[in-house]
């Protein structure tokens, strides 16, 4: 039961926070930066650059 409560809380926080982050990023004309996802995106871009050309 506690796990369901924790997952529900995390889901509610994610649903309420992510649109705000996306809106701020759009207003400033930059890609959204959400902690670990931003780092993964940078890593994948660097990895793809290795095979470009």
From Swiss-Prot:
Can you supply one Gene Ontology CC term for this chain's record? extracellular region
Identify the domain of life.
Eukaryota
Q: What is its main location?
A: secreted
Q: Which residues carry this modification: Lysine amide?
A: 52
- Chain positions listed as propeptide in the UniProt record: 24-29
Q: List the keywords (alphabetical).
A: Amidation, Neurotoxin, Secreted, Signal, Toxin
Stretches of the chain forming a coiled coil according to its record: none
Q: Does the keyword GTP-binding apply?
A: no
Q: In which tissues is it expressed?
A: Expressed by the venom gland.
Name the Gene Ontology molecular function terms of this record: toxin activity
- Subcellular location, in the record's words? Secreted
Q: Which cysteines are joined by disulfide bonds?
A: none
Which range is the signal sequence, renumbered to this chain? 1-23
What does this chain do? Answer: In vivo, this neurotoxin paralyzes about 70% of blowflies (L.caesar) one hour after intrathoracic injection, when tested at high doses (45 nmol/g).
* Protein known as: U13-myrmicitoxin-Tb1a
Q: Which organism is it from?
A: Tetramorium bicarinatum
